């Protein structure tokens, strides 16, 4: 953070993956605590598009508690009260990005990504964290289906060829970058 020579200001969203319950594929709270507290950040996430232990807000909050994130900061499941659309530039597959309503509550975002394998995307990192991670449940479905549907129940029957998914993910990540403008950092 210090090496970037830019200060996060205002209401700061710290975008991470809170990780699947029982798993270890997330940044450990002890690793990010000092940065999160230095910028008075709120850890932000959105619910998943698949049924599991982060599909509902209540279960997602419990997963974040179990992984220790509530011990270091406030945690906001941004689509807990709805969603809204933000524009995308590249409309080859998706016409907009569907994000959690609480995104409006933040002036600045720090994208704290970790590297892991992903069944559809190849590798997860900054782009996945900013696209799939900021999208609401319906938004995740919309991206994964390359704009065919936003209905989570229809996700698995509408998967596109991989390039269409990857291009949709890139378009949605760009929309979040555009939304924050200069008020975003990538670590």
Question: What do the PLM-derived regions correspond to, one by one?
Answer:
Residues 1-38, 42-187:
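Extended, low-polarity segments enriched in aliphatic/aromatic residues
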């Amino acid at each position: 953070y210090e090496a970037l020579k830019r200060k996060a200001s205002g209401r700061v969203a710290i975008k991470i993956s809170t990780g699947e319950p029982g798993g270890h594929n997330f940044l450990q709270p002890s690793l990010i605590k000092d940065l999160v507290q230095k910028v008075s950040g709120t850890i932000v996430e959105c619910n998943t598009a698949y049924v599991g232990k982060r599909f509902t807000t209540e279960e997602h909050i419990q997963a974040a508690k179990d992984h220790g994130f509530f011990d270091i900061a406030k945690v906001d499941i941004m689509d807990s009260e709805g969603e809204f659309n933000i524009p995308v530039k590249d409309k080859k597959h998706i016409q907009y990005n569907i994000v959690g309503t609480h995104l409006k509550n933040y002036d600045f975002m720090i994208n704290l990504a970790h590297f892991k394998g992903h069944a559809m995307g190849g590798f997860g990192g900054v782009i996945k964290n900013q696209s799939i991670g900021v999208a609401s449940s319906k938004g995740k479905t919309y991206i994964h289906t390359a704009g065919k549907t936003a209905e989570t129940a229809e996700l698995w029957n509408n998967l596109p060829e991989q390039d269409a998914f990857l291009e949709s993910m890139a378009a949605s990540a760009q929309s979040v970058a555009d939304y924050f403008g200069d008020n975003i950092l990538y670590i």
